[in-house]
Each structure stands twice: as structure tokens, then as C-alpha cells.
């Protein structure tokens, strides 16, 4: 990876690029890396954790997953992070706002809306979060004529070796699920990345991965009878060919 060397809060040197664009077509395959083993169970558990609006890591421990342990407090709490903001954003008068359900409802009634946005960057609560959101905002784009749904994600910070593969697959799965709920087909997943960085201690592994030949493309199957985002459960998701 080209780019200047930089130092960050971790104390590990990175190579960084600013303003990286990534586009992933979803109509014929599902994006999960095959040049290294990616723990799909962790991705699945995390996404459904987000969708439930939870902020405690107990469900991860019940599934022997430790990806959030580093940031949780002694009680397993992470503060008002992704799921809380997406499903219960605090309103001006003390009410909560379910951003994700509002987007789904709007796609159904007004698919050409330019307000199909879910944001996790609540400035007033950043200090209460154990880790500020990396993937900050996502915007859906519906094509009613073709019945295609796309998703653009803005990610302020992307660890390209470890974090980005998770984020790519997780958001692709989210797009598939929302598309099914509204009767559309998933089309494109797009990322706009602010700081895309490779840690110095990952460089050798990254070079090795680049030398590997990818396996056949994967496909995703969802339970076709689910039409509400809160009806979906992890058992509805089947990854074919991994």
C-alpha cells in the first residue's frame, strides 16, 4: 500500500491514504474474501447485534466471540454506539427515533427520497461511546423501475487488512436484508473511505494475501419469507460456497 507513514492512538505506524473509493457489485455474488479465512459467524453476530440495538457484549461471549472485548467496560457495556444510534437515536424532546425502520418505510412509500440515511455519528454522545463509529453513515438509493437497491457507506477510518473485510461483508448483508424487506434486488455497495490505512505489522501478511489466487465467488441465501427487518434471525442467513 502506498501512502505516507503516520502515527495514531495505537502507537503503531500505519501507511495511510485519504479519500479511497470502493465499489462492489452484488447482483451475481456476495463479497467475502476467499484469500484468507474470514470469521463469518462474528460478522453475522455483530450485524444482528446492531439490528437489535444492543450495546452490551454478552451475546458475543455466549457465542465465544471476542471482537469487542478490547473496548467494553468491566460490565461489558460500550455506550451508545452503532445499534443504539441506528434503532433509538435520542430526540429533542426525549423520544427515540428508529432510523433504520424509517428508511425501510420510506423506500416502500417514497423510493426516490434523498433522505434514506442512517447515521451513527451523534456528536452529543461521542464522549459516552467506548469507541466512536468508524462506519459513520450509510445512504440507500432505490431504483423503482429496475427494483434495485444500492447502499453507499461513509467510513471515516478503515483498517484495510482486518476491519474493512468485516465492514464490507456486514454492509453487503445489511443491503441484502433491507432489499428483501422492500421487494428489491441488491445492486451496488459503495464505500467512501476517509483514512484508509494499513498497519506496519500487517504488511507482510497483506503481501502474502495479494499473492494468493481467489477461490470461486460466493452466493448468499436468505429466508425468502421474511419481510420485516426485526423478523430476521441469524439462522435465516446461508453463505453458499465458503
Say what each PLM segment does.
Residues 1-242:
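Terminal, non-catalytic protein-protein interaction segments that mediate quaternary/complex assembly
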Amino acid at each position: 500500500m502506498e501512502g505516507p507513514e503516520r502515527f495514531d492512538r495505537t502507537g503503531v505506524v500505519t501507511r495511510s491514504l485519504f479519500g479511497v473509493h470502493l465499489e462492489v457489485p452484488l447482483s451475481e455474488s456476495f463479497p467475502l474474501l476467499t484469500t484468507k479465512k474470514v470469521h463469518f459467524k462474528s460478522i453475522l453476530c455483530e450485524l444482528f447485534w446492531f439490528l437489535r440495538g444492543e450495546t452490551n457484549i454478552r451475546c458475543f461471549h455466549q457465542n465465544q466471540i471476542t471482537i469487542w472485548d478490547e473496548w467494553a467496560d468491566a460490565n461489558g457495556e460500550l455506550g451508545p454506539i452503532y445499534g443504539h444510534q441506528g434503532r433509538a437515536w435520542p430526540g429533542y424532546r426525549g423520544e427515540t427515533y428508529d432510523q433504520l425502520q424509517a428508511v425501510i418505510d420510506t423506500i416502500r412509500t417514497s423510493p426516490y427520497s434523498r433522505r434514506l440515511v442512517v447515521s451513527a455519528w451523534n456528536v452529543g454522545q461521542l464522549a459516552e461511546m467506548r469507541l466512536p463509529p468508524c462506519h459513520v453513515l450509510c445512504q440507500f438509493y432505490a431504483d423503482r423501475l429496475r427494483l434495485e437497491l444500492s447502499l453507499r457507506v461513509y467510513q471515516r477510518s478503515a483498517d484495510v487488512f482486518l476491519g474493512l473485510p468485516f465492514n464490507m461483508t456486514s454492509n453487503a448483508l445489511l443491503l441484502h436484508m433491507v432489499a428483501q424487506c422492500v421487494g428489491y434486488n441488491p445492486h451496488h455497495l459503495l464505500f467512501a473511505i476517509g483514512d484508509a490505512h494499513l498497519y506496519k505489522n500487517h504488511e507482510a501478511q497483506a503481501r502474502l494475501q495479494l499473492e494468493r489466487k481467489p477461490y470461486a465467488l460466493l452466493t448468499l441465501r436468505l429466508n425468502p419469507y421474511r419481510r420485516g427487518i426485526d423478523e430476521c434471525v441469524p439462522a435465516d442467513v446461508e453463505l453458499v460456497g465458503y
